[in-house]
Amino acid sequence: MPKSSNLKMQRKGSLRENGLVKGLNKNKFSISKLKELSHADDSRKSHRIIRSGKSSGEAYKQAGKGLMNLGNHLSDWGAKSSNLSLNDISDKIGVLVSELGETEIEFVKAFNENRIKFKAIRAMEDSIAPSRAHRQRLISSIEREEERDPLSPKLTDLQNQLVRTEAENLVGEMQLDNTSREVFKSSFQGLMDAFQLRAQKQMTLSYYASQLAELINDEVAYPGDNPAAYSQKYATQIMHQCVESMARLLAPVTSETTEHVGSDCEFTRKSSSSVEFSDHSQDSGDPSQQNILQVKNVQAVLSIPEAESYKAQLLSSIAEEQKKKELQAKSTVFL
């Protein structure tokens, strides 16, 4: 078992220290820096979020293309092998590796859709920037006029302008606040859902690819040995099960599945392909049918309210177990 220290997050609960984020390079000059300068000061931080998200999406896309090429080369390499197991398994694993690359490409689409939502916040910040600047100029003008001549008639006009500007600014600030909360929530909920779906797909595909690799006999062979003959039947069964698991993963949630899972666990949904695998024999009398994989559904990724409910139930069960242990300890002492 790994040490508990290895299971900790590499970052603290906040990236800020004294209100600043360490290691954030803002002074590096580039073409994208020129684009950033075209936006108001108030919207440059949101512009950096959009820009850095774009580079991250491109990196995921390149990784997906690389995996698809890897799968193609793997299948091409195995086609020339005289070993039947290598020939067949390399082709099938190549298919699954290519599918892993395809999941990256699909993830990038969802990633960009949610990243672009931040443009609404940037546009709102750009639109409210002139009002903020005008308000600040009026405040500075009033301060200068008061220092020069406290009885100046211009003060009344400037103060009236400031009242009107602050009223307009108040409406704009409220619109910005509403837009920021709505877009931030929608964007990152969609983004985290995309991460969860990508992880489930990769978990499913990588598991079956690992099971295919297990079918290869890696024992050392010597001249004159007669290794066991390879049968494509088990590899074909694994591929069929993989297809079925991926289909279940992408199947929409229905009221029937929700009610069925709700009877077992109130906070889970049966919309995921999160799978657990167990060895099962189709025919107990035939030893050749041993270790055939069988898939069964387990709980899916929880939504935020469901996760909170699960957390509350989990804490409650832990508290009850702790009370039982304390009562048992007390009864032991009395005895």
Swiss-Prot record:
Main location (coarse class): cytoplasm
Keywords: Cytoplasm, Cytoskeleton, Meiosis, Membrane, Nucleus, Sporulation
Biological processes annotated in GO: ascospore-type prospore-specific spindle pole body remodeling; endocytosis; lipid droplet localization to prospore membrane leading edge
Matches recorded under InterPro entries: AH/BAR_dom_sf, PIL1/LSP1
An MF annotation (GO) of this entry: lipid binding
Gene3D superfamilies associated with the record: Arfaptin homology (AH) domain/BAR domain (1.20.1270.60)
Cell location: Cytoplasm, Cytoskeleton, Microtubule organizing center, Spindle pole body; Nucleus membrane; Prospore membrane
GO cellular component, one term: cytoplasm
Highest taxon of the lineage: Eukaryota
Nucleus among keywords: yes
Keyword flag Nucleus: yes
Membrane topology: Peripheral membrane protein
Role played: Has a role in nuclear division during meiosis II where it stabilizes the proper segregation of the spindle pole bodies. Also has a role in the formation and extension of the forespore membrane.
Designated name of the protein: Meiotic expression up-regulated protein 14
Organism name: Schizosaccharomyces pombe (strain 972 / ATCC 24843) (Fission yeast)
Upper classification of the organism: Eukaryota, Fungi, Dikarya, Ascomycota, Taphrinomycotina
